[in-house]
Amino acid sequence: MTLTGGAFRKIGFMPIDAKLPQGLSRSFFLPVAEALGFGESRRKCPVIEDLDWLMAGTTRALASVVSGRHFLQTIVEEVASAWERTTYFEALKSKRRLDLLREINEFVCRVTMRTVLPDRLAGIPGLENYDVYAGDGHWHEHATHDPRRGRKGGKGEDKNHRIHVATGHVFGLNLRTRAVVHLAHCDEKTKIKEHDMGVLKRLDRDVLRQGAAKGRKVIWIWDPAGISYTQWYKWKASAGIYFLSRPKTNMIINHVADRPWDKADPINVGVERDGLLTEGPQTPIRLVVFRDPATGKQYKFITNIMDLAPGVIAQLYRMRWDIEKIFDSFKNKLMETKAWAKTTVAKSMQANFMCLATNLATLFEHQIEQEHGVSNAPETKRRAQRREKEKTEVEENGKELPILHQTLVRATQTSVKFIRWLLCHLWKPTSWEAALKPLRRSYATL
């Protein structure tokens, strides 16, 4: 998949949407078929066609299967004709298929989701020229056949003792569209647990820009593991990439030069200080101090973004929690708690299929709501009630909630009810009316 000036170049293959199955699965996988038309790594494979491979891998990420053999014996026959065990596991190690999978998810994130889904940050002033992402690392259990690599050192322990190393990945979440992207697989061969900043420094700047148009700025919101003032300066100066984080617990902040900010603006409710660090970093670093009116807890944020209101800075970091909800969904809804295979390619394949499955589910949930009027209305109502209760309690204490905290009430993840319904009905040859009936009932009663 080629990006030229921010546009994808279509590859000269015949249209393949006719190969899609009928029923719900056709609508669910249609974005994949559309993206395949732009896939440079696409090939005509007589054993496992690329479309079948992509549908099968996405289905495995959605399904609660405990192993590849379990998947082959139960789920895969719904997707395509039965595959040989060795053929499937060899395909998991294919660098070409991994490249194609990345291209497909890239197209779905950068084109389909940006076109179809509403902009969740549209109501925040000052962000018109920014793409905003939350990023973090996520770890799960090693593969069954992973060799013991790490050394468990420490006082009183055998320094030659070999241990299994957990599988780690670094992901990003587009806060405008909820698109999930896989940034990198963490180094397991030389490190027991690679630090987030070590992974970030390995990434090409184009990966961090995520296809942003020339002249457009990109914000990454990270926990304290993403702090490096020197690296922040390099990314900002060379690629227009900005970072927002919270100070590390051992970080001493004594000298701050105050910056002017509008204390009457409802956006800045809760802000106690906005200033520049004047000692330590060579590059300008901004400090925002915020106290949550609901809990009374004080938070400090550091960033190299200088042109956003301090209340916007606080709200953006609050939204970083959305990526933690994605990780919770990986673990407790998709049940992806263990690596599929031992090779680096296969582990990256799994992570990208987890992203693609999540993104397709987000698109499909939106489509069903828009075209059929089916949504999780009871949960939306409960969310609004919780927010109204919080607002009332704060006002009773003589305070007020920040305006952005009141208006940006949104779902942060796809519900487990929808995931269960999707997996149950995805491959059934049933009508939309028959398939949506149990979803309506689930939303209303469960």
Model regions: which residues?
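Short amphipathic alpha-helical "interface-anchor" segments enriched in bulky aromatics
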Residues: 313-341
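Active-site-proximal, Lys/Arg-enriched surface segment
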Residues: 92-175
